[in-house]
Amino acid sequence: GFIDDFRQSDSLVMIDPVLGDNGKLYTNFDEQMILEMRHLIRKADVITPNMTELFYLLDKPYKAENTDEELKAYLHEISEHGPGIVIITSVPVQGDPRKTSVYAYDRQGNRYWKVTCPYLPAHYPGTGDTFTSVITGSLMQGDSLPIALDRATQFILQGIRATFGYEYDNREGILLEKVLHNLDMPIQVSSYELI
């Protein structure tokens, strides 16, 4: 396939396994799509599923609340299917609906990371795509995984905050042009933690 034909030694194969959200598959997706995605992620270096997609990829029933230990087990399990780095987005923080987290596992270093940030009650299509793009750019420029997580999480939060104040059709996604310049600025290396 395409990845096998074009992969180079310095390539980074990043897959955002778009399947669903909020515990449900997207309406135009079915079981066959899940099976194909399970096959595709075997070729990835990095995957960025949200919580819903994680459970579909693992063939487990969706569970909104999970402990750090459960999430670490899920990260490790899905990593065994191929990707060396697994990043789970949109992880609710137990007991605090005003926060959300991103969890990550780096199989090579056998380390787990978590970044927690404020949750804003706004939904914009494309935030997962933007998050994955920032992670990709950060890793390609040589940032460590925790720095890439910080950069992407902060950028998405800034984008949502910048967009939230405008009378704007949410279906248009976040107003990237309002925050794009922030990618050139130093990040606050303070929000990630090793778990």
Positions of the model-derived regions?
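Charged C-terminal helix
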Residues: P146-I195
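Glycine-rich beta-alpha junction loops
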Residues: L19-D21, E53, S90-Q94, P118-P121, ...
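Conserved phosphate/ATP/ADP-binding segment of small-molecule kinases
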Residues: T27-Y112
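Short, charged, surface-exposed loops that flank catalytic or proteolytic processing sites
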Residues: P61-L71, M140-R151
